[in-house]
């Protein structure tokens, strides 16, 4: 028991070293954590910001641009630097400012090769049949530019920049 009493004063007198394991941004006095623009600093620094032409710590204007310049300590307004807000007339505009997120349910079948054929070629085939401009084997007497293409030419044309694929 007496040994413990003798060790306590020695332990209290020894300097202790400590290593901080917390991150720098989590410290108590870390001002980078909170954006407090134009609020920090002493009265002397704030007075220098107001009076000096080019203070060492400029006043943060938060993105607002000046509409003039300082000439001999006086602020001169420049009309060209004042922004004009041009609002267009939207009375006949078909677009509305709010679009509902509740879009109508659209059910569409899978687009097949038959659908593609009907969309592109069926109208011309029916017109050629009614006009009687088909040959005995079913090929047209006067083929269009798309019908004259070979399979390799059509393949290259479909892969070209500006086609419907891209």
From Swiss-Prot:
Tagged with keyword Transit peptide: yes
Subcellular location: Mitochondrion
Superkingdom, natural source: Eukaryota
Assembly: Component of the mitochondrial ribosome large subunit (39S) which comprises a 16S rRNA and about 50 distinct proteins.
Keyword Nucleotide-binding: no
A molecular function (GO) term: structural constituent of ribosome
UniProt KW keywords: Mitochondrion, Ribonucleoprotein, Ribosomal protein, Transit peptide
One Pfam family it belongs to: MRP-L27
One cellular component term from this protein's GO annotations in UniProt: ribonucleoprotein complex
GO BP of this protein: translation
Gene: mRpL41
Xref: InterPro entries: Ribosomal_mL41
Segment annotated as transit peptide: 1-26
Family: Belongs to the mitochondrion-specific ribosomal protein mL41 family.
Name of the featured protein: Large ribosomal subunit protein mL41
Organism whose genome encodes this protein: Drosophila pseudoobscura pseudoobscura (Fruit fly)
């Amino acid at each position: 028991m007496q040994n413990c009493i003798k060790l306590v004063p020695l332990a209290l007198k020894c300097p202790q070293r400590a290593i901080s394991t917390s991150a720098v941004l989590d410290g108590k006095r870390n001002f980078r954590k909170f954006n407090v623009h134009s609020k920090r600093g002493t009265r002397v620094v704030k007075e220098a910001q107001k009076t000096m032409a080019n203070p060492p710590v400029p006043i943060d204007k938060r993105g607002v641009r000046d509409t003039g310049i300082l000439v001999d300590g006086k602020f001169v307004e420049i009309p060209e630097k004042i922004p004009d807000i041009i609002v267009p007339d939207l009375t006949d505009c078909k677009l509305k400012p709010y679009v509902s997120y509740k879009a109508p349910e659209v059910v569409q079948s899978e687009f097949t090769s038959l659908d593609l054929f009907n969309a592109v070629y069926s109208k011309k085939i029916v017109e050629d049949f009614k006009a009687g401009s088909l040959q005995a084997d079913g090929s047209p007497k006067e083929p269009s530019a798309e019908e004259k293409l070979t399979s390799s030419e059509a393949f290259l044309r479909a892969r070209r920049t500006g086609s419907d694929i891209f």
